[in-house]
Amino acid sequence: MTTLPRYAVFGNPVAHSKSPQIHRQFALQEGVDIEYERICADIGGFAQAVSTFFETGGCGANVTVPFKQEAFDLADEHSERALAAGAVNTLILLKNGKLRGDNTDGIGLANDITQVKNIAIEDKTILLLGAGGAVRGVIPVLKEHRPARIVITNRTHAKAEELARLFGIEAVPMADLNGGFDIIINGTSGGLSGQLPAVSPEIFRDCRLAYDMVYGEAALAFLNFAQSNGAAEVSDGLGMLVGQAAASYHIWRGFTPDIRPVIEYMKAL
């Protein structure tokens, strides 16, 4: 059995995950060796897979689709962020043997926007497209940055209204949207199949940044749509991915990685 600190990402599917490469770069910055693996848990077998991992020397884990809600249920303790998000993407085994769950997605998004792209969230008007778990997970941290206004919209308006009530933000039907948004964040899953949110091109006319929470080819349709209709800057979610990973790494090891060189490294792969 390895004596190196062991970490893993759990998902299904998970073979595509870039987390091992990212965390390897963080370990190089810290000057340590770690082991980081991908674990594809069976649907219905997540809890057992996590239990086995920690019982055999695991120190910390990332959790991706479709297990973030199960990870929340599995955790013995939760951070305030995780409680607000209702989902967990980071697990750490505490010295007392309990599992603590955290959610670093919002930190990853906010740090990419404010620190890497140097765009302030404070006093800005933000539009969130989508009302699923990905969007819910980032709202608490966005609110901490004190934007002037957060508007949420979704194909099924009732879901947007539900999150609006939960977090004290505004819900507006997609058909009623027009311009006036500084930052537009796409958290819908349509890009994975090339589909665009059913919004007017007019929403981008005042847009400083259009951001897709997914990365790579899946983000291209939305980003091209935004840029061609007036968005000053567009970005996929690679920086969010690296940023949330860095926050997880800090929770596990107390070391804060510099995300900028890792983002550039991942772009070059």
Swiss-Prot record:
Quaternary context: Homodimer.
Reaction equations catalysed: shikimate + NADP(+) = 3-dehydroshikimate + NADPH + H(+)
Cellular compartments per GO CC: cytosol
SUPFAM superfamilies found in the cross-reference section: Aminoacid dehydrogenase-like, N-terminal domain (SSF53223), NAD(P)-binding Rossmann-fold domains (SSF51735)
Gene3D superfamilies, alphabetized: Leucine Dehydrogenase, chain A, domain 1, NAD(P)-binding Rossmann-like Domain
Catalytic residues of the enzyme: 68
Pathway: Metabolic intermediate biosynthesis; chorismate biosynthesis; chorismate from D-erythrose 4-phosphate and phosphoenolpyruvate: step 4/7
Protein family per UniProt: Belongs to the shikimate dehydrogenase family.
InterPro entries linked: Aminoacid_DH-like_N_sf (IPR046346), NAD(P)-bd_dom_sf (IPR036291), SDH_C (IPR041121), Shikimate_DH (IPR011342), Shikimate_DH-bd_N (IPR013708), Shikimate_DH_fam (IPR022893), Shikm_DH/Glu-tRNA_Rdtase (IPR006151)
Protein function: Involved in the biosynthesis of the chorismate, which leads to the biosynthesis of aromatic amino acids. Catalyzes the reversible NADPH linked reduction of 3-dehydroshikimate (DHSA) to yield shikimate (SA).
Keywords: Amino-acid biosynthesis, Aromatic amino acid biosynthesis, NADP, Oxidoreductase
A GO BP entry: amino acid biosynthetic process
Pfam families attached to this UniProt entry: SDH_C, Shikimate_DH, Shikimate_dh_N
Annotated gene: aroE
Positions bound to shikimate: 17-19, 64, 89, 105, 215
Signal peptide: none
Annotated binding of NADP(+), by residue: 80, 130-134, 154-159, 213, 237
EC number(s) given by UniProt: 1.1.1.25
Annotated GO MF terms: NADP binding; shikimate 3-dehydrogenase (NADP+) activity
Organism: Neisseria flavescens
Protein name (database record): Shikimate dehydrogenase (NADP(+))
NCBIfam families: aroE (TIGR00507), PRK00258.1-2 (NF001310)
